[in-house]
């Protein structure tokens, strides 16, 4: 019952997300992105080779996977020129930085559940949060939530499992 899990865990977040505007980068972040772009635009044409995307992203502290890079390139380089302008690069990096913020938000939520600091969300943790949020869920429904998120079968939800289940929601 992922929907209950999502509901129980992000009641206040939903309202906040609806009210907050799309994430904006700070001037400092934009400057860092510009510097990384300029570093690879050695000939000053205002474009970089799409093959340099991974290296440029790494210079900004990201470790993109090969499949992720291929997907980004196919979305950006629709004409197959092999080049990317600053605007495209800024769009990609804004999205990546937003994802990084999202992960941090999810991990903060995880810590709220994991009040006993075991590194896992137990049935007891989930029951406490549901009660605090005024969610009237049966033990069976709570256990179903744990079972749905629990990939390694240990009966609890670790950070990776929590990230996975939360990213499946439309809340993040």
UniProtKB/Swiss-Prot annotation:
Record location of the Glycyl lysine isopeptide (Lys-Gly) (interchain with G-Cter in SUMO2) cross-link: 22
GO CC aspect terms: 9+2 motile cilium; apical part of cell; centriole; centrosome; ciliary basal body; cytoplasm; glial cell projection; nuclear pore nuclear basket
Pfam short name (any one): EF-hand_7
Region entry Required for self-assembly, spans: 2-25
Region described as Disordered: spans on this chain: 1-31
GO molecular function: calcium ion binding; G-protein beta/gamma-subunit complex binding; heterotrimeric G-protein binding; microtubule binding
Subcellular location: Cytoplasm, Cytoskeleton, Microtubule organizing center, Centrosome; Cytoplasm, Cytoskeleton, Microtubule organizing center, Centrosome, Centriole; Nucleus; Nucleus envelope
Residue numbers bearing the Phosphoserine modification: 20
Record's keyword annotation contains Lyase: no
Chief location category: cytoplasm
A biological process term (GO) from this entry: protein transport
Functional summary from the UniProt entry: Plays a fundamental role in microtubule organizing center structure and function. Required for centriole duplication and correct spindle formation. Has a role in regulating cytokinesis and genome stability via cooperation with CALM1 and CCP110.
Miscellaneous section: Binds two moles of calcium per mole of protein.
Family: Belongs to the centrin family.
Oligomer and partners: Monomer. Homooligomer. Interacts with CCP110, SFI1. Component of the XPC complex composed of XPC, RAD23B and CETN2. Component of the nuclear pore complex (NPC)-associated TREX-2 complex (transcription and export complex 2), composed of at least GANP, 2 copies of ENY2, PCID2, SEM1/DSS1, and either centrin CETN2 or centrin CETN3. The TREX-2 complex also associates with ALYREF/ALY and with the nucleoporin NUP153. Interacts with USP49. Forms a microtubule-associated complex with POC5, POC1B and FAM161A. Interacts with CCDC15.
Protein name as catalogued: Centrin-2
Species the sequence originates in: Bos taurus (Bovine)
Lineage of source species: Eukaryota, Metazoa, Chordata, Craniata, Vertebrata
């Amino acid at each position: 019952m992922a929907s209950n899990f999502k509901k129980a865990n992000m009641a206040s977040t939903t309202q906040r997300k609806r009210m907050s505007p799309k994430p904006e980068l700070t001037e400092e972040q934009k400057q860092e992105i510009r510097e990384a772009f300029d570093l690879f635009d050695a000939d000053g044409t205002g474009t970089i080779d799409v093959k340099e995307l991974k290296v440029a992203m790494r210079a900004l502290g990201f470790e993109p996977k090969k499949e992720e890079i291929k997907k980004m390139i196919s979305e950006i380089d629709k004409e197959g020129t092999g080049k990317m302008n600053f605007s495209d690069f800024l769009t990609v990096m804004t999205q990546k930085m937003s994802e990084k913020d999202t992960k941090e938000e999810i991990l903060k939520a995880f810590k709220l559940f994991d009040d006993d600091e075991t590194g896992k969300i137990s049935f007891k943790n989930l029951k406490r949060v549901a009660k605090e949020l005024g969610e009237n869920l049966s033990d069976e429904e709570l256990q179903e939530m744990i079972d749905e998120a629990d990939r390694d079968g240990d009966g609890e939800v670790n950070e990776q499992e929590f990230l996975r289940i939360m990213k499946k929601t439309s809340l993040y």
